[in-house]
């Protein structure tokens, strides 16, 4: 058992002190953080999923510039590469950012605006190159928001309620995903309006979040320890490059969590990311029936996700257990994902939404807290 794994046993006492302030959070601060995490995940996921799961796939079909499945796969594949590097880069840059607004806030706000710009480009382009370029900008902007926002969990949230706030973040993310597919299905025949709503939601995500959260402390004072702007630049490059070096000490649980999340998200998105095409080409539904089925699936998954995520997060804090809850959620997801293989119809997809959604709510509500707990270095 590694040192970072020692956080999980029931004998451990999780701290109730906020790392950034060295004191307990007030009730008002807890509510502000909770609402901020919920709205952050909810808003950007509604915008992103309405486009990526419904509107863009349908637009690819109507553009008639190639096989829509190939276009969607190309967009997602290239976008994943940009997302991976952007998350690491902007996470590292936010760690060393010095401003009177703090080190996370500027990136969260700027990320939302950049995401909106990329979303407009992806929708307005009628060629594959423009679509992919726009989506890559979306991934850069989204991760410019996500990396610093998730870091707030370890920066400012006490250990003893981290599972609860992870539930706020994760639960709202999945509810936002369901709400996004529902929204997209309602604009499948009026895509211009749907994309305009999505772009507006992206633009306000970061602004709304930082206005609701308790104001981040200024990080500008740290500049005094740096002798010159040249030294600052060298420090930035050195720390940025160090961010790409995989950890080698006290990292067993970190890599287990990383691989587990990678495999689970891969399996989940093989269904949820292509659900419009699955309904149309695997289940044989029309565009209208596919939209109606997606709406129903969204409502089903939204209900079960709210219930399971809001229960599993606080439960993990009370039990001081993360791994067992994540494992249970993963098994339930696997059962849900398997159903459409044996029931290639609308009912099978609805059962996937209900059973798989319940498991995903359990998993995602606790997974982020687990990832923070098993970091080899809590300061990075």
Regions found by a protein language model. Give the residues of each.
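Juxtamembrane intracellular "pre-TM" segments in multi-pass secondary transporters
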Residues: 8-31, 216-259
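Intracellular juxtamembrane helix-capping segments at the cytosolic ends
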Residues: 56, 144-157, 362-377
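Helix-loop junctions at membrane interfaces in 12-TM secondary transporters
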Residues: 121-134, 341-352
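Helix-to-loop junctions at the C-terminal end of transmembrane segments
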Residues: 85-101, 308-321
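Helix-loop boundary and gating motifs at the non-cytosolic
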Residues: 18-80, 253-285, 297
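Structural signature of the two symmetry-related core transmembrane helices
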Residues: 104-120, 324-339
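Glycine-rich segments within core transmembrane alpha-helices of 12-TM secondary carriers
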Residues: 79-84, 163-185
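Symmetry-related core transmembrane helices of the 12-TM Major Facilitator Superfamily/SLC fold
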Residues: 110, 193-211
